[in-house]
């Protein structure tokens, strides 16, 4: 009886151990089967892919960053060229004429004529179309201080520069004053200098303003003392530019 009881109990223990081993083996097999696809998915997630399924590599980190952000290089635009005609304008520079007269240069230094403007010393500046123009004029003057003594009023000189227009509706022989400037200079004498002229003095008369002009009218400059004009660079000029 005792031997049979032990044998029956040992058989039950052996069957129970076999069952545990079978369960453990099945669990390990399921774990292995689940781990394989998860590992494959993790590896695929780490591999860079583009929309077409191909991997692209860029050697330049900056270019790679631009590609990742979707930047595109735009084509270079050619500079636009303004083909519209410019407004009439002129800038003339004072130049000496024979006989101590005042003439005007149209091409030297900063002088120019544009958009159909024309000039001649005999007839003045001709503007090609009706419109509102800004006219300006600056005439530099210089002189020498006279000897000491005498009446101070006799030493004073009034310098005058004027802009006129002629032609067109005003007729060829009927000039009209447009703008004018004037300045009176009284040189300071040196009491110690009784004979001979003193040092040079310098001044300028300038003005500008808006004038309505018509095609065919001509604008010219008239000055009071052409023998005192200063022809140094930037001292004497006049011009016009259409503003409306």
From Swiss-Prot:
Subcellular location: Membrane
Topology with respect to the bilayer: Single-pass type II membrane protein
Domain spans labelled THD: 88-243
Gene Ontology CC terms, in alphabetical order: extracellular space; membrane
Name of the protein in question: Lymphotoxin-beta
Family to which this protein belongs: Belongs to the tumor necrosis factor family.
SUPFAM superfamilies: TNF-like
Glycosylation sites recorded in the entry for this protein: 222
Gene3D superfamilies, sorted: 2.60.120.40
Keyword Transmembrane annotated: yes
InterPro entries referenced in this protein's UniProt entry, alphabetically: TNF, TNF_C, TNF_CS, TNF_dom, Tumour_necrosis_fac-like_dom
Membrane-spanning intervals of the chain: 19-48
Organism: Pan troglodytes
Record's keyword annotation contains Cell inner membrane: no
Subunit structure and binding partners: Heterotrimer of either two LTB and one LTA subunits or (less prevalent) two LTA and one LTB subunits.
Residue ranges annotated as Extracellular topological domain: 49-244
GO terms under biological process: cell surface receptor signaling pathway; gene expression; immune response; lymph node development; positive regulation of canonical NF-kappaB signal transduction; positive regulation of extrinsic apoptotic signaling pathway; positive regulation of interleukin-12 production; skin development
Role summary: Cytokine that binds to LTBR/TNFRSF3. May play a specific role in immune response regulation. Provides the membrane anchor for the attachment of the heterotrimeric complex to the cell surface.
Segments on the Cytoplasmic side according to the record's topology features: 1-18
GO molecular function, one term: cytokine activity
């Amino acid at each position: 009886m005792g031997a049979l009881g032990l044998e029956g109990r040992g058989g039950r223990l052996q069957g129970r151990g076999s069952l545990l081993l079978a369960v453990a083996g099945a669990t390990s097999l399921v774990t292995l089967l689940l781990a394989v696809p998860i590992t494959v998915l993790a590896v695929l997630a780490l591999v860079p892919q583009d929309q077409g399924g191909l991997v692209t590599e860029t050697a330049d980190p900056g270019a790679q960053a631009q590609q990742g952000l979707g930047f595109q290089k735009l084509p270079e635009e050619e500079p636009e060229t303004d083909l519209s005609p410019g407004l009439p304008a002129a800038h003339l520079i004072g130049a000496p004429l024979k006989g101590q007269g005042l003439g005007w240069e149209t091409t030297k230094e900063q002088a120019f004529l544009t958009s159909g403007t024309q000039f001649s010393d005999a007839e003045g500046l001709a503007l090609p179309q009706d419109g509102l123009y800004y006219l300006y004029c600056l005439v530099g003057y210089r002189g020498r201080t006279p000897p000491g003594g005498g009446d101070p009023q006799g030493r004073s000189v009034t310098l005058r520069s004027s802009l006129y227009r002629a032609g067109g509706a005003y007729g060829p022989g009927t000039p009209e004053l447009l703008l004018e400037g004037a300045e009176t200079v009284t040189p300071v004498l040196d009491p110690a200098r009784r004979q001979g002229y003193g040092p040079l003095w310098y001044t300028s008369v300038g003005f500008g303003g808006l004038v309505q002009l018509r095609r065919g009218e001509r604008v010219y400059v008239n000055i009071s003392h052409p023998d005192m004009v200063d022809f140094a660079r930037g001292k004497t000029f006049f011009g016009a530019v259409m503003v409306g």
